[in-house]
């Protein structure tokens, strides 16, 4: 019987299989659901455009490291995750810092699906302080160890970032001076509105604000593709300042703001490489 003699099927079910000629050495089959992603194996540039959401297991293996190191990212897509320590460590971008870092290694951006700890935004003696060196800044930096238990400390890439630093203002004129501090060697830190939503929503966009500068100007691809916020029932801080003593947060299923003294969750992200740094 010829293939052309077989009945035509217009819809493929998830458990259907297709025949694969394995380079002339054998005949194998592949499930239809796997074929949908396997066909992009040699097109790593598609990784920031496709959401899959598959479990990658509970260990960061040598195979994972090799695929990241080479920049091929085979069998890794947006939304894929490692489940370790009761947390889903989800891929939200590929090579995010390639446009802002000289000779950046191939990397993935990993954001946990839930809060890793809680903190006030800053302290009473610095109630109008900006994000840089605040309580939540330092607390997020200390959470590098949580990432290291899964990925290994040497695979967490330090990157340059831009943080709101000095602050001058009052409740009447909330921003008459502030500045952005470019700082290297950042391993784990909180995302801002640009990274999650692609634009400023609650953060002040007042003219003359140097601290509005953004290191890449790019939204994490996972959210750019329309993925919902993981575990939206949890509240957590973002690093943007919305008023002279208020910061942006996620709360009540939406972008919100809260005063510096209240505690919210911390969900820092990290850039993970395939080779040691």
Spans of model-derived segments:
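Collagenous Gly-X-Y triple-helix signature in extracellular proteins
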Residues: 40-277
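Residue-level signal for functionally critical sites in structured catalytic/ligand-binding pockets
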Residues: 6, 16-17, 26-30, 267
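Short, surface-exposed terminal/edge motifs of secreted or surface/virion proteins that either
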Residues: 1, 20-39
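A ubiquitous, low-specificity "background" feature that marks scattered single residues
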Residues: 11, 21-22, 27, 139, ...
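Short, intrinsically disordered N-terminal pre-domain segments
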Residues: 1-15
